[in-house]
Amino acid sequence: MQPRYAIAALLIATLSITGCTTNTETQTSTTQATDQPVAAAQAPEAIAAAEPVINGFQPLPADKALTKIAFGSCLHQSRLQTIWDAVLAADPDLFIFAGDNVYADTEDMAVMRGVYSELAAKPGFSKLKATTPILATWDDHDYGVNDGGKDFPQKAKSQKAFLDFWGVPTDSSRRDREGIYHAVIVGPEGQRTQIILLDTRYHRDDLERIPQDQRTGGPYAEKDDPSVTMLGDRQWAWLAEELKKPADLRLIVSSIQVVANEHGWERWAALPWERDKLFQTIEDARAEGVIFLSGDRHHGEVSVCGGTGPYMSVDVTSSGLNQARGRTITEENHHRAGEAVGDNHFGLLTIDWTPEYPTVHIQLIDEQQRAQFDDTLDTKKLTFTYGEGDHHGRHSQSVANPE
């Protein structure tokens, strides 16, 4: 079987990209452009990476450049987990769990802990845990309730169960905050990867449901209300500060999709004012090199758009470690690069730090170790000077036609 390549050289070439704008108005940043990446101008002598971990998890070294980052989502603890052979064969420096890492859906924390114990007993997961550093965020099913938000009554207890399972020390400051959001910066100057793991559950307001007889896809409309929140005030303030820290590549892990907006299921576009705020926060911080990683959808795809921010937005969705739909995906997504992946798979980012701007080889790899998506991103396209030039980084009209 040949890999399902994205549109020929779609990401490595100069792109023409459909915009990500919604029906809200976003204020333009007054920050002036510079010719140099913000990271180079603000670099401190050293930045600590992840805190220590416990319970047999592997620490993430602070000073080692990351060259292979694997990630995935939607892993049912009671089903076969044959994907781990392919993950371990890829030998990643880090694995990121992007949510729905177990399916608990419960307010009973004894049940929640039992579900985590079932995952811990899986041989493939045990091998990963013993050999590979792991970072994780949650989505609704490991949060505790399908499509849940801020009103879940057991969210504080669920947070404790999450942090306990994923090896976060009992004296960590992460146990004092409301929500599991977290960030690390790894690697030496010039090869620094920032990984920001958002919590899209703990503070999220209710979504707006579409009446059953009016649905053409998922159940959620765009809620045109600037007062609602996805992240909550404290997490927003934290994110703004994190994005000001110097880094050469930034991965923002969101359990739900950031770019795709047509399907009607949970997505950032369901709260369009918050989605615009996300792009604006990146722009205000002058944060270059952002790639979104997402899950939730039970299929894989890469979505690309011009966005309301200063350069194109790339969202790599890997969803279905063992919960993929197992069929051809016909769902419309006019931001999609290439084809969607309906088989169980994981995402793999391979970073080449040799060029002035690193390149990121993006693959979605199935259980047979076949790359069903395979393309390379030149991160120069994720810079302010590129986005503000004549490269269609901001106001393009077509996703299908690279220049």
What are these regions (language model features)?
Residues 16-19:
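C-terminal motif of bacterial Sec signal peptides marking the signal peptidase cleavage site
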Residues 27-31:
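Extracellular mucin-like PTS domains
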Residues 21-23:
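Bacterial signal peptide processing site
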Residues 38, 42-403:
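Metal-dependent phosphoester/phosphodiester hydrolase catalytic core
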Residues 8-12:
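Hydrophobic helical h-region of N-terminal Sec-dependent signal peptides
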Residues 1-7:
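Bacterial N-terminal signal peptides that target proteins for export
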